[in-house]
């Protein structure tokens, strides 16, 4: 879907050009690498005009998504944008008058006309300075209000809460009946696969140690998912677990909510230097992956750009112990393989379907019951234009559980991270950087390891005639990635081997 670009123009565009002037270079891949004098990114470049011209639809969109907005946020953008344009018009007028006064001074070496022009120029200089300061304030008011707004929503996204999700497809074998004997914690305890007690002693509730075959299963799942992503054209990347909180916010993640007092959803690293940027543990590899593309301009001929990141996800909100947080289902840290793509604005929807096909290929190979859901408006968060979830049946829990997610964020992240592209064509070559279109970004889970382990243990447990668990049947696709672990002989591959 093509997204209309901002036509704010004027000082905002001049500011962006000034930040970049003389600081762009092109690498061997044809990427314009933009160097700024400060380590921080330029302010987000949001489309105030589009917001101002669509107050009703933008307000309804926020309402449908249950976004918690400041009072009158959408209308505030429109009011401040109108004021910004008025001030800019007056500022340009005063600048023109000052220019005329300057020409008069140049033409007259002396005399009353020159003296009057000098006096007028001095007065206009003060007016221009005052108007520039007022314009900056109006810009900041526009930005502050606009940053609170969520992305637009795909017209086919279901309206409502999580229960309104639409099942798009089902895959894999028929779901087994719900059975408490298949609880993954009980199975893991029996085979010494999971050490929650030590995790609690060492780090606290919702931390864990994987042991024996469970540790090997994590390695096998990781390499299996990475290998398929690479086969589908994704470039492998290992990501840092630490990111600047500014990058997370620009991606649509809020390190702290607006409760009183604020509740942190991410782990914050204590500053040792007050001048250092705030650092957090990444909630997903999506954040550092998106950051690698920030403040760059790509040639559309080299797009889409596709990477698969191996990282750890840290979640501070694992929550109180309950059936929903039992064992490995909701934890504070887990290994996660993340698919990330940067596309042109007219190809992101087709890329979403391409990524979904990769996710289904990975998960269908595990031979577990799956369903793909089109998620409703209240589940989209701030950044997603459309979101698919893939859930696996977990008979021990007696319910479906999310094992993968996929979001098309359109230009929500790229406008905040300054990810642009240069379209092909004769006129595009001469297009100034500030007028180039923003790219679209997409992210999807290739493998969230603990949830997959839950699904594999609960669906693959083997019981004897007395109802005692005696082994684990694992999918054959993992066998090439399995290392060691043959001493106990509890794993049976679904190709009949052990």
For each feature predicted by the language model, list its residue ranges.
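N-terminal alpha-helical targeting/anchoring segments
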Residues: 2-174, 193
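TRNA-recognition modules of translation machinery and tRNA-sensing kinases, especially anticodon-binding
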Residues: 44, 70, 86, 171-498
């Amino acid at each position: 879907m093509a997204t209309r670009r901002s036509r704010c123009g004027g000082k905002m565009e001049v500011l962006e050009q000034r930040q970049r002037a003389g600081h762009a270079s092109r690498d061997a891949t044809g990427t314009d690498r933009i160097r700024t004098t400060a380590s921080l990114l330029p302010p987000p470049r949001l489309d105030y005009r589009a917001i101002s011209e669509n107050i009703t639809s933008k307000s309804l969109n926020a309402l449908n998504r249950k976004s918690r907005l400041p009072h009158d946020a959408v209308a505030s953008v429109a009011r401040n944008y109108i004021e910004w344009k008025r001030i800019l018009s007056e500022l340009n007028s005063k600048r023109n008058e000052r220019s005329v006064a300057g020409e008069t001074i140049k033409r007259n070496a002396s005399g009353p006309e020159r003296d009057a022009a000098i006096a007028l120029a001095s007065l206009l200089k003060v007016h221009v300075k005052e108007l520039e300061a007022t314009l900056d304030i109006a810009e900041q008011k526009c930005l502050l209000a606009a940053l609170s707004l969520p992305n637009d929503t795909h017209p086919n996204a279901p309206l409502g809460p999580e229960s309104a999700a639409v099942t798009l497809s089902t895959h894999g074998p028929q779901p087994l009946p719900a059975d408490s004997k298949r609880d993954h914690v009980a199975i893991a305890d029996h085979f010494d696969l999971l050490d929650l007690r030590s995790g609690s002693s060492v780090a606290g509730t919702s931390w864990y140690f994987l042991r024996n075959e469970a540790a090997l299963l994590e390695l096998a799942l990781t390499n299996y998912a990475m290998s398929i992503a690479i086969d589908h054209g994704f470039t492998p990347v290992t990501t840092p677990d630490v990111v600047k909180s500014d990058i997370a916010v620009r991606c649509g993640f809020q390190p702290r909510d607006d409760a009183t007092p604020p509740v942190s959803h991410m782990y914050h690293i204590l500053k040792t230097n007050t001048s250092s940027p705030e650092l957090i543990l990444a909630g997903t590899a999506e954040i550092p992956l998106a950051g690698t593309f920030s403040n760059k301009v790509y040639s559309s001929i080299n797009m889409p750009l596709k990477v698969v990141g191996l990282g750890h996800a840290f979640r501070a909100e694992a929550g109180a112990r309950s059936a929903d947080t039992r064992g490995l289902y909701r934890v504070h840290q887990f290994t996660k393989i993340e698919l990330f793509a940067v596309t042109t604005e007219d190809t992101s929807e087709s890329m979403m379907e391409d990524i979904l096909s990769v996710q289904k290929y990975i998960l269908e190979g595990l031979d577990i019951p799956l369903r793909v859901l089109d998620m409703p408006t209240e589940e989209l968060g701030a950044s997603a234009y459309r979101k698919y979830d893939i859930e696996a049946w977990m008979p021990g829990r007696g319910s479906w559980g999310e094992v993968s997610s996929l979001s098309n964020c359109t230009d929500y992240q790229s406008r905040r991270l300054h990810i642009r592209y240069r379209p092909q064509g004769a006129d595009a070559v001469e297009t100034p950087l500030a007028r180039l279109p923003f790219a679209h970004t997409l992210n999807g889970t290739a493998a969230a390891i603990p949830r997959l382990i839950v699904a594999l243990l609960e669906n693959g447990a083997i019981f004897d005639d007395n109802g005692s668990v005696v082994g684990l049947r694992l999918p054959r696709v993992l066998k090439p990635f399995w290392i060691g672990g043959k001493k106990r002989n509890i794993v049976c591959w679904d190709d009949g081997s052990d």
